[in-house]
C-alpha cells in the first residue's frame, strides 16, 4: 500500500467485504478515512478504526449532496456500493432493473458528480469504482441485470478518466471475481442448497477458491 499521509478518503459500502477491507487498508496507509454505509450496525464496527462514519443511502441524491457539503474535501473516492441480481433477461423485471442500476451505476454517477468539483478545486484526486469481472472480461450465466449495470460502471469510469485527466484526476475501475463476504454467504444461503451452491461458485473460479476482500483492498 502506498503512503497516504495527508490524504482524505471517502468510501461507500464500508460496513463489510471489500469496502471494509479497503477502509482498513487506507487507515494503515495513513489516510484520514471517512466510511459510509446504509447499515448502521455494520458501520459501527469501524467506528474505532476510521476517523469518521456516516450513514448514507447512495440511492438518495440529497443525502449524497448533504454528506459532501459536511465533510472535509476528499482526495480519494472509493465507490463500492452494489447489489447482485440473479436471473436471465426473461426472468428480470423493470423493478429489478431499476434497483440494480440505481444502486450499482446511478449512485456512482451522483457520487462522482458531487465530488469532482471538490477535486478540481484541490488540483487533483483519485476515483476508484468497483465494477466486476462480469461485464469486463466475460459474461456470467444468470447475471443479466448485474452484468449490464456493471458494464455501465466501466463506461462511467472511462468517460470520467478521459474528461478530467487534465485536472489531475484519475478514475479507475477494479473488476473482482467472486469475493468471500457476508453478502456472498447470504446469496449462497438464499439459493436453498448452500453446499451445492458453494461448490458451483468455487468451481468456476480460476484459482479454485473465492477471492479475499483484503486482496482487492491491496490493489
PLM region spans:
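Substrate-binding pocket helix/loop in short-chain dehydrogenase/reductase
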Residues: 88-89, 96-101, 201
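Active-site loop-to-helix junction immediately N-terminal to the catalytic Tyr of the SDR YXXXK motif
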Residues: 92, 138-147, 159, 187
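Active-site helix of classical SDR
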Residues: 112, 149, 157
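Alpha-helical segment proximal to the catalytic Tyr-Lys
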Residues: 117, 162-163
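Residue(s) in the substrate-gating loop at a strand-loop-helix junction
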Residues: 132
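C-terminal helical subdomain
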Residues: 173, 195-219
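Short, flexible catalytic-loop segment of classical short-chain dehydrogenase/reductase
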Residues: 176-186
